[in-house]
């Protein structure tokens, strides 16, 4: 199959493209591989996984801030259960190579959580964690 045909399948039927690319990899049929799009998709997978973990961390911080500062005891149990779920999902999805980037981005993640809480509650929250 020509590279143009492979690219067309990528653009029009992504699912079919994944099936064909996986088959070409299994068969080590390297001339049938759409290297450019494979590289982009692998990079996108990494970004997506990182984004999911960062989002879960932000939600956990958001709920911790609500528990500590919103003074809504009737909501605490729900918020705590949500935090447990976020933490379990983080643990499941976190890979060692994400940790340095999360540490680098932590201040921004924290600020996003603060912004979400302040959109709902009029509170004095710490500007840094």
Tell what function each PLM region has.
Residues 1-58, 64-129:
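Surface/interface-facing alpha-helical segments and adjacent flexible terminal/loop regions used
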């Amino acid at each position: 199959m020509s590279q143009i045909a492979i690219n067309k399948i990528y653009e029009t039927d992504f699912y079919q493209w994944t099936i064909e690319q996986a088959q070409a990899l299994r068969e080590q049929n390297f001339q049938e591989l759409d290297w450019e799009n494979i590289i982009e998709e692998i990079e996108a997978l990494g970004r997506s996984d990182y984004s999911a973990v960062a989002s879960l961390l932000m939600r956990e911080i958001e709920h911790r801030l609500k528990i500590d500062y919103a003074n809504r005891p009737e909501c605490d149990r729900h918020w705590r259960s949500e935090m447990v779920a976020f933490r379990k999902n983080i643990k499941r999805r976190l890979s060692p190579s994400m940790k340095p980037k999360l540490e680098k981005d932590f201040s921004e993640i924290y600020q996003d959580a603060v912004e979400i809480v302040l959109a709902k509650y009029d509170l004095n929250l710490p500007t840094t964690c």
